[in-house]
Amino acid sequence: SYTVRGYQCAESTAADGLTADFVYVENALPVDLLNVKGKIVLVNGFLRVPLYRSLMEAGAAAVVTMDGDIHDDLENTDLHQRKLRSALRTFGNAPAVQLRTVDAMEIVNKGASRAKVTVQNKNITLTSHNVIAEIKGTEHPEQIISFGAHYDSVEFSKGVYDNGAGSVI
């Protein structure tokens, strides 16, 4: 059993999960995708449009991506939260999770051929706020300096230097 983090907005599995054949396709070249239909597919990296489109067109039942590197300090790092954005979902929606790179290496090295993925997402719509400031020039009032920031929080924020930390400088 491995710790994974589900992609936001990805399809949920049944409550008891999805069990299927498992395959590692590394960078998902066309030749690697010939026999992925109905399988849980592990790819190297995270999801971008060309990769996700190829996986959906090939019929992947679920997608597993890697996060971090083999030297991550497990006590002080966590899996990033990724989102299956609408640009990706236009090609289909499948359960999608990510796991640590070190765990992915172990799974591949063990020659895993079956896997079970359990994802239970609840998609909700919330309101986010932005901060916009405008300073007019004193000598040239037609000239301005403007600032903007989103006022919702993001994980792993470094404080006020990330404009998603709920602070504006």
Which residues make up each language-model segment?
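Protein/peptide-recognition domains central to ubiquitin and immune signaling
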Residues: 1, 65-66, 72-83
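Structural recognition of the beta-strand scaffold that forms the well-ordered cores
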Residues: 24, 40-43, 62-65, 96-98, ...
